[in-house]
């Protein structure tokens, strides 16, 4: 899997400690809608990191603190290659773990856009519990606490949906 960053213990993006995996690409769809401001601009300039999915799963499962895995910015659902990398990671995780951990995908796409672009995505992942955070970053929007994620989301159009 190719990523931009990995935070092995993240306490910001979910109500429980998580492993945060920053995906490598984005089409910057939010920028035209928001005066060309990107919250992930600096991340997009970082080096690409190649890491074996099995090693990453082992690292996650050997950490007694983390309870979830987050795939996030840049854009996890940017292209089919990124989606396949996530599916591969989840497949390895599902076969290796003794208990179910939550997988979270932070996407800037709307729910309708995800359903149009990847109509079988939620079914194809075959992993529960799965949370998808939908919606774009809008600068100077009204933040709110999402009840599923248990954290503040920066834009009013953003929300999480739990698939069980």
Give the ranges of each region predicted by the language model.
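Flavin-dependent oxidoreductase catalytic cores
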Residues: 69-72, 81-82, 157
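Short Fe-S-cluster ligation motifs
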Residues: 55-77
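Structural preference for beta-strand elements that scaffold enzyme active sites
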Residues: 18-20, 68-70, 102-104, 131
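Canonical radical SAM enzyme core domain
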Residues: 41-58, 77-123, 131
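A cross-family glycoside hydrolase active-site/sugar-binding cleft signature
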Residues: 22, 72-74, 104-108, 135
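Classical nucleotidyltransferase
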Residues: 118-119, 126-164
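Canonical Radical SAM [4Fe-4S] cluster-binding loop centered on the CxxxCxxC motif
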Residues: 4-52
């Amino acid at each position: 899997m190719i990523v931009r960053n990995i935070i092995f213990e993240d306490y910001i993006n979910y109500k429980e400690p998580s492993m945060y995996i920053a995906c490598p690409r984005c089409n910057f769809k939010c920028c035209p809608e928001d005066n060309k401001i990107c919250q992930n601009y600096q991340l997009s300039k970082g080096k690409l990191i190649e890491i074996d999915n099995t090693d990453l799963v082992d690292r996650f499962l050997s950490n007694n603190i983390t309870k979830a895995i987050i795939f996030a910015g840049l854009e996890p659902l940017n292209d089919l290659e990124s989606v396949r990398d996530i599916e591969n990671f989840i497949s390895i995780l599902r076969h290796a773990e003794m208990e179910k951990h939550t997988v979270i995908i932070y996407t800037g796409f709307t729910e309708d856009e995800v359903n149009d672009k990847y109509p079988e995505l939620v079914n194809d992942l075959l992993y529960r519990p799965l949370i998808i955070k939908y919606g774009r970053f809008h600068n100077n929007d009204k933040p709110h606490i999402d009840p599923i994620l248990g954290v503040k989301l920066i834009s009013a159009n953003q929300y999480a949906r739990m698939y069980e």
